[in-house]
Amino acid sequence: MEDWTQAIQNALEYVEEHLAGELEICEISRRAFLSPFYFQRIFSTLCGLGVGEYIRYRRLTLAAQELCSTDAKVIDVAAKYGYN
């Protein structure tokens, strides 16, 4: 199980570093050295969320934090995190 968690951790680090950009499951799964299909199954089992769900949740969380802590316009923050 430790190997799987490290593989998922590597992928999560990549996702966190690229949240403001475009993320593709092929590239994310490559970071875990797994096929996209198998990666999604393991990710869902270990994290309790699908990959797309996790990415949406993290982007919304970061956008909410930015809106609360800055004077940025909603439209600008939305565009920054891919909600256009």
Question: Language-model features: where?
Answer:
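Basic, helix-initiating cap at the start of DNA-binding domains
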Residues: 1-6, 53
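A generic structural signal for ordered secondary structure
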Residues: 27-31
